[in-house]
């Protein structure tokens, strides 16, 4: 997992193929309407908006074919993280959606507007949650094939 200011994410371009195109797309979207925006090579950017949910009892997710870059545009969210190898897969891994749901023990951090985090296939992550008080957020989720 990588956590950094969005403006510094370019430092990781060598290990994140497709990053440059995604950053340009996010910068070009004037209204950032919640939707899915396709990129080349099966990559995409999802603009999401909502209110965080309680982390209590929530399941994490992990992917096998994509990594996520979650960039908080407005507000904040807390994210839970744990190595996927330490988690328990709940049900079947959904190959079509490239998503498995996991339970286990997580470490949490709050991500503020202007910051992003990168989660790789080995990172179980619980995005869009809160520990105490719900918070509104708007974010760009960049999905890059690995």
Q: For each of these PLM feature ranges, what is it?
A:
Residues 40-42, 62-66, 72-74, 112, ...:
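Short connector loops at helix/strand junctions that flank enzyme active sites
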Residues 45-63, 73-87:
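Conserved short histidine dyad/triad with adjacent acidic residue
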Residues 65-77, 85, 92-98, 143-144:
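Short, conserved beta-strand element in jelly-roll/cupin
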Residues 1-47, 57-62:
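A short, N-terminal "cap"/entry segment at the start of jelly-roll beta-barrel domains
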Residues 110-129:
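Conserved metal-binding segment of the jelly-roll/cupin
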Residues 65, 101-106:
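Short alpha-helix capping/helix-loop boundary micro-motifs
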Residues 69, 116-118, 134-146:
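A short hydrophobic beta-strand segment most commonly corresponding to one strand
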């Amino acid at each position: 997992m990588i956590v950094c200011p969005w403006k510094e994410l370019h430092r990781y371009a060598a290990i994140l193929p497709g990053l440059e195109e995604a950053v340009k797309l996010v910068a070009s979207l004037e209204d950032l309407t919640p939707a899915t925006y396709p990129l080349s090579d099966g990559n995409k950017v999802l603009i999401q908006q909502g209110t965080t949910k309680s982390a209590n009892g929530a399941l994490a997710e992990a992917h096998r074919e994509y990594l996520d870059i979650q960039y908080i545009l407005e507000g904040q969210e807390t994210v839970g993280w744990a190595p996927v190898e330490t988690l328990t897969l709940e049900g079947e891994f959904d190959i079509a959606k490239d998503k498995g749901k996991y339970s286990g023990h997580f470490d949490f951090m709050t991500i503020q507007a202007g910051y992003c985090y990168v989660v790789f296939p080995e990172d179980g992550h619980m995005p869009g949650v809160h520990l105490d008080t719900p918070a509104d957020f708007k974010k760009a989720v960049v999905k890059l094939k690995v």
